[in-house]
Each structure stands twice: as C-alpha cells, then as structure tokens.
Amino acid sequence: MQLYLSRLLLIVTRTALRVTGVFFWVLVYVAALLAAVSYIPDALRLLTRGPLSAFRWGPRKAAPACLTSSAHGQHGYIRMKDSGIRFHYVASGDKRNPLMLLLHGFPENWYSWRYQLDEFSNGYRTVAIDLRGFGGSDAPSRLEDYKMEILLQDLQDLIRGLGYSRCVLVGHDWGGTLAWTFAVRHRDMVTHLIVMNAPHPSAFHDYVLSHPSQLFSSRYVFLFQLPLIPEILLSLRDFEHIKKPLTDATHGIQNVECKLSKEEVEAFVYYPSQKGALTPPLNYYRNLFGFFPVKAQDVLVPTLLLWGEHDAFLEAAMVPEMQQYVRAPFRAEIIPNASHWLQQDRPQEVNKIIRDFLKEDFLVHRN
C-alpha cells in the first residue's frame, strides 16, 4: 500500500507543479485525499482501542510548571506596531550582547530551546519566541494571516522590536524553513544562519520529486490541507498524535538522558489542547502551497546545517543537496543516533558545534 500511494502521490505532485490556477489546487486536494487514505489504518487503530475514549479530549486547565518557569530565562511579551500581534518570548543574557533568535517548529513552542537558552546566554542575548499562532503568542483566526510574507515580516519586526538590526538566526523544522527564507530575503539582518532538520525550500522541492519515500514521509503536509480532519486526528485519544512523535521509539527523542518527562510532554500538549488552538499552527501548512513553485534562492551568509541521522520525517540523504544553495561558508553535520528533535535530543553535541561555528572568522563578500 505504501509503495502504491507513494507512486500516486508522486504522479499527482509532479503534475500539480506543471500547472497553475484552479487545476493546481484540484491536484493538491487530490493528493490530500490520498494522504488521508494512508492514515485510515492509524485512525482505526486508535478507535478500536476504545471508540468512546478516543474522542475524549479537552483543554488542560493549567500549564505545566516547566512551561511557565523562569529557570531558562525571563518571560516577556512584545507587540508589533503595524500588525498589532503580541508575541510571547523567553529571553536570557545581557541585552548588550548580540541577538540570537531561536525559532521553533511544529507542534512546539519556546520550550524546545531550553538547552540553548542556558548554553548561549553568556555571550548572546538569546531569545526563544513563540511563533505567531503558537504557544503564548497571538493566534489570528484567518487562514491568510499565516502566509509566508506575513511570517517573514514578523521576524523583521521582532528583530527591530527587540532593539537590534541583525541577529544569529536559528531555526528548527518550520522555524528552519522560515530561517532559510528570511536569510535569502533579508540577508543584511542575519549574521549567521543555523538550521536544524529543515531543508532549504528549493532543495526539498528537487529532492522530493525524485524520492517517493520522502514524499510518503511528508504526506502529512497534504493531509493538513484538508479542513477539520487534521484537527480531529491530532486530538484523538487525548492528543496522542502530538505526544507520539516526540516520545515513541521510531519518531521521538533517541537519547535516553534527554527523554521528555511527563511534565515536559505536557509542555507541548498544553497549548494545542486549548479550544481552536490547533488550527493556527496547521494554517502554516495550509499556506505552504501558495509558496510554490519554489525558485532557486541562494543564501549569502555563513550557514550551519545540523541534521538528526534518524529523523523519521525528513531523510538525512537530502543534506548534501543544500550546499548548492549557499554561496557563503557552509558547514553541514549529520548527528548520529539523533531524531528530528535534534536540539532537545543531543543538546551537548549541538551546542558545541554551534559554538565552534560561531567562533570561526568568516570573510564574506556581500554582493
């Protein structure tokens, strides 16, 4: 079944990228329905374990202590002048130090960066934000409020609002996608780019069209285009599909010493459990195809790419494809025995590589 669906998805995706307009979106939704079919066995598994209990979920009444603690930095809010959006962040380090801006992925929040907030606050003003629609930040209800251009404008406004003109930009997963794109569009605002388990958009576009296995692994992107169904699937059996990717043996954190405690798992369930809170993060994906077709976009700032070898969502084999899109000093490291959740899985190794990278002297000639 996997092989059959992979081939069908590949045919539909390749065709969609050759057309425009209404037909393009028809094909996207055909792919979404194919993806939904692939998740039917998983949904049935959850239902057969107890049909009534599968549909029992509700908002957590209180955030876990680790999510509100100041152990990793001070919590703050900043409101953007133009958009009016209020962002929640956790910051550590002297405000006179250079800014290191940390961008999380899906379905996460600032807490993903706790190890980096601790590590780099002695030399940087480290700021881990909750992206628009996530965590404690505002979550506009309209689909169009999550278009790429708006998300990039958020980053511009955040950097300036925090009192800086440039930053070390660090992103993981969706935060990595934003970081790649921001570094292309606003290179003068980025001194160093550090990306974890997120492909350059152009490289991913090329890779996925020639690797059906990756297309199948990424089929959730198509599933998330559908209304309501993803929200229901992610909520089933008390948000099992949020917990499981973080914790199980195949998808979750591999390092025994860094396995999430029950309280830490709740740090990633608390916000999605609130009424209507899953839709804004899913709207990132629902706007993704408006970003296609992807054109070749070169990064012109020193770039570090880190990848967990055992990423169950994004194949490590695509890492060599990234270098062609970076016309600046580039370093790529695949971390053995590490999952998609790299900065939480192997924090000591990740932090050392980042620190060594930031110590290097780069002479970059800007065009």
From Swiss-Prot:
Endoplasmic reticulum recorded as keyword: yes
Cited InterPro entries: AB_hydrolase_1, AB_hydrolase_fold, Epox_hydrolase-like
An annotated GO cellular component: membrane
Record-linked Gene3D superfamilies: alpha/beta hydrolase (3.40.50.1820)
Pfam families, sorted: Abhydrolase_1
Keyword Metal-binding in annotation: no
Residues spanning the membrane: 21-41
Known regulation of activity: Inhibited by 1-(1-acetylpiperidin-4-yl)-3-(4-(trifl uoromethoxy)phenyl)urea (TPAU), 1-cyclohexyl-3-dodecylurea (CDU), 12-(3-adamantan-1-yl-ureido)-dodecanoic acid (AUDA), 1-((3S, 5S, 7S)-adamantan-1-yl)-3-(5-(2-(2-ethoxyethoxy) ethoxy)pentyl)urea (AEPU) and to a lesser extent by 8-(3-((3S, 5S, 7S)-adamantan-1-yl)ureido) octanoic acid (AUOA).
Catalytic activity: an epoxide + H2O = an ethanediol; 9,10-epoxyoctadecanoate + H2O = 9,10-dihydroxyoctadecanoate; 9,10-epoxy-(12Z)-octadecenoate + H2O = 9,10-dihydroxy-(12Z)-octadecenoate; 8,9-epoxy-(5Z,11Z,14Z)-eicosatrienoate + H2O = 8,9-dihydroxy-(5Z,11Z,14Z)-eicosatrienoate
GO biological process, one term: lipid metabolic process
Main location group: membrane
Active-site residue list: 173, 285, 340
Keywords: Endoplasmic reticulum, Hydrolase, Lipid metabolism, Membrane, Microsome, Transmembrane, Transmembrane helix
Topology of the protein relative to the lipid bilayer: Single-pass membrane protein
Listed EC numbers: 3.3.2.10
GO terms assigned for molecular function: epoxide hydrolase activity
Localization (cell): Microsome membrane
Protein role: Catalyzes the hydrolysis of epoxide-containing fatty acids. Active in vitro against epoxyeicosatrienoic acids (EETs) including 8,9-EET, 9,10-EET, 11,12-EET and 14,15-EET and leukotoxin.
Family annotation (PANTHER family): EPOXIDE HYDROLASE (PTHR43329)
Family: Belongs to the AB hydrolase superfamily. Epoxide hydrolase family.
Protein name (Swiss-Prot/TrEMBL): Epoxide hydrolase 3
Organism annotation: Xenopus tropicalis (Western clawed frog)
Lineage, opening ranks: Eukaryota, Metazoa, Chordata, Craniata, Vertebrata
Gene: ephx3
